[in-house]
Amino acid sequence: MTDVVDADELLRRMHRARACALEQERTWRGRRDELRTTDPEGSHEAAVRSLAYEAVLRVLDEVLTPGRNTA
C-alpha cells in the first residue's frame, strides 16, 4: 500500500471502481426484485445493498465528473 501512484493510474482505478459499483448495484437491484414476493427480508437486505452501491456511484460520479449530475 506504499506504492506511489500517478494521477492517470488513480483515475483508471477510480473508473474501475465505478464500473464495479455499477455492476454490483444492478446485481443487488435485480436480486431485490427477484426476492420481493418470496423472501421479503432478503429483498429488503438486497435493497439496502443496492442503495449503498448507488451512494458509492454518486460519490465516484461527482469525483470523476464534478457538477455533471446535479439533481
List PLM regions with ranges:
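Short, charge/polar-rich alpha-helical segments
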Residues: 1-23
